[in-house]
């Protein structure tokens, strides 16, 4: 059975690249009826954050990514790691190294002077003497001194490394006894039955070391898939300088989780020419063998397009609920359905939608200077005044308002744009709004007449 995992370190928020990695692992497991587990790699007790760990779980919940079983925390497994470190020591596959920091620094300087790659020289590999006093040893694995390390990467294909070029007897336990990253990963992946590891190709250099440990411990090596990085629009690795990278920041900016997942799954994976994928579609079609070898580019416009699509196709009931996160509560508004319909067609984010609704429902305290100067003059004021006087019937529907308005304009010999733009300024304080006919139905005749009156009386229009 396929078993995948997502194993973040809780030293910060869950970033976009991490969510894509989690999504790929999740989809591969679900597409094959397998298991997907969440493991928190919190062995670095100094840098760990409970808040960060909780934020990862919160992001999973928001995105609808469920995991199997309980969350595994590495910090609760130190005894297990010590057991396997001792096993390697007992089998003479690892050893204690008493080399001091000063000795390591000297060795590194000498190697760099000779233009050699800095690496540990193995001086304690077969040490049988009396250990030096005052030094707490690290534990090093006995890495192969020659030969090659090979594996078939599901994305990059056949990978081959010369052991002597890339390996030394690397540390598996620090001098304080805490295990290192590569060691804990191997122990946990093996004991948790992880069959496939999909991760960023920044981990490619770790893979030979982990294979050494799998072989030393007699564990089965999982299938590796190393995914190319996500780049910003400038071709450099995605970072904060390109905008938000925190997954939950996208929620706060008004993106829907299904839009974000749809966007991320297409960063490196494709299924024909399709662009729109529900989570169920992804589960049905996802195959890691179809992940591109090339880096993908984070395209903000594409994300906005997808988000607009999902907003447009969301139920009004859901959008009304989502807007409460932006302090917009229209649950009891008599025209809530029309209000949502008027904005969902053109909104790129929920934040945009909330801002538009708030602008519409709140009487303008000021007027956008550019719009005011362009559309408000003596002629437009007179036209607004006359239009206000014909708004006498209550509870008119948008279609009826449109008919009444067109009759008025025909009588006055005016075009719609000569009324619509000044009316938008009067209603919202800007030149932007949904259809003025829908706006009049939403706000009601009395409110429209009041806003027209307020604009005409405004000192800026004198």
Swiss-Prot record:
It catalyses: tRNA(Glu) + L-glutamate + ATP = L-glutamyl-tRNA(Glu) + AMP + diphosphate. ATP binds at residue 240. Its EC number is 6.1.1.17. InterPro entries: aa-tRNA-synth_I_cd-bd, aa-tRNA-synth_I_codon-bd_sub2, aa-tRNA-synth_I_CS, aa_tRNA-synth_I_cd-bd_sf, Glu-tRNA-ligase_bac/mito, Glu/Gln-tRNA-synth, Glu/Gln-tRNA-synth_Ib_cat-dom, GluQ/Sye. It is found in: Cytoplasm. Its main location: cytoplasm. Catalyzes the attachment of glutamate to tRNA(Glu) in a two-step reaction: glutamate is first activated by ATP to form Glu-AMP and then transferred to the acceptor end of tRNA(Glu). Belongs to the class-I aminoacyl-tRNA synthetase family. Glutamate--tRNA ligase type 1 subfamily. HAMAP family: Glu_tRNA_synth_type1. This is Glutamate--tRNA ligase 1. The gene is gltX1.
